[in-house]
Amino acid sequence: MILGVIYDLLRWEEKNLIQEARKLGHTVIPIYTKDFYYFYNNDSNETLGDLDVVIQRNTSHARAVITSTIFENLSYKTINDSSTLIKCENKLYTLSLLSKHGIRVPKTIVAFSKEKALELANKLSYPVVIKPVEGSWGRMVARAIDEDTLRNFLEYQEYTTLQFRYIYLIQEFVKKPDRDIRIFTIGDEAPVGIYRVNSRNWKTNTALGAKAEPLKIDEELQDLALKVKDIIGGFFLGIDVFEDPERGYIINEVNGVPEYKNTVRVNNFNVSEYLIRKIEEWIKK
């Protein structure tokens, strides 16, 4: 099998993915995005050869979507495809799809003026969480304890360069324990995950200091993860889940280019090898 791995930053995951693929006897062609280009309707494009699959590993959402689109235009199988990446990156798109199919998500308000956002936030009761429509690693996600705090956050958002700065996404503050769950779907399975524990901060992103711990996946969580995968699409997803003491599992977000270094470390589970073997099965079908 010939694999292309496209990346803009060579992190542990990309290095491990290339290493494990080569260990399994596959040919890997690393593609550095900043050196990559494409001319539409032009014969001067450099050929990438007979790639069986391109694995998308760009950290930049824009680069990921556009390069996946190019590879799809060239008829390469791409993990993940551009449609999946768009659904994952846009939180309102994700929430809309999941709620439409009966998946429990945080109570969410979307408003198009600051005044309406402030008015509707009272229906959720404080504290509330404000987050950008697009973004990752917990950046620009804030908790407002009252209306005055929320107003300040909304005004700050308006003066940023965010693409959706005049769209206000406000959610309930889910009273989860000092942790959340990241569970991975690979192909048609949900084989591994972690708890992300942070007793010092309400944000549970490992990028913000949360500690990874092994996750024992129960049947309900596994079924839920696979339902989300079927709705969103994609071959390799990282799904973030809250545990509400009364309502049970709540899907928070879905990541289309998930990091997994900490998952490998605490579970002693080779995510890269598992992913490659599932790709092998997929290609043979």
Curated annotation (Swiss-Prot):
PROSITE patterns: ATP_GRASP. Mg(2+) 2 binds at E253, N255. Keywords: Amino-acid biosynthesis, ATP-binding, Ligase, Lysine biosynthesis, Magnesium, Metal-binding, Nucleotide-binding. InterPro entries: ATP-grasp, ATP-grasp_RimK-type, ATP_grasp_subdomain_1, LysX/ArgX_preATP_grasp, LysX_arch, PreATP-grasp_dom_sf, Rp_bS6_RimK/Lys_biosynth_LsyX. It catalyses: [amino-group carrier protein]-C-terminal-L-glutamate + L-2-aminoadipate + ATP = [amino-group carrier protein]-C-terminal-N-(1,4-dicarboxybutan-1-yl)-L-glutamine + ADP + phosphate + H(+). One of its GO terms (biological process) is lysine biosynthetic process via aminoadipic acid. It comes from the Archaea. Mg(2+) 1 binds at D240, E253. SUPFAM superfamilies: Glutathione synthetase ATP-binding domain-like (SSF56059), PreATP-grasp domain (SSF52440). A motif (N-[TS] motif that is essential for LysX substrate specificity) lies at residues 262-263. Binds 2 magnesium ions per subunit. ATP binds at residues 91, 131, 135-141, 171-182, 196, 205. One of its GO terms (molecular function) is metal ion binding. Its EC number is 6.3.2.43. Residues 95-280 form the ATP-grasp domain. Its cofactor is Mg(2+). GO terms for cellular component: cytoplasm. Pathway: Amino-acid biosynthesis; L-lysine biosynthesis via AAA pathway; L-lysine from L-alpha-aminoadipate (Thermus route): step 1/5. Belongs to the RimK family. LysX subfamily. Homodimer. NCBIfam families: LysX_arch, rimK_fam. Catalyzes the ATP-dependent formation of a covalent bond between the amino group of alpha-aminoadipate (AAA) and the gamma-carboxyl group of the C-terminal glutamate residue in LysW. This is Alpha-aminoadipate--LysW ligase LysX. It comes from Sulfurisphaera tokodaii (strain DSM 16993 / JCM 10545 / NBRC 100140 / 7). The lineage of its organism: Archaea, Thermoproteota, Thermoprotei, Sulfolobales, Sulfolobaceae.
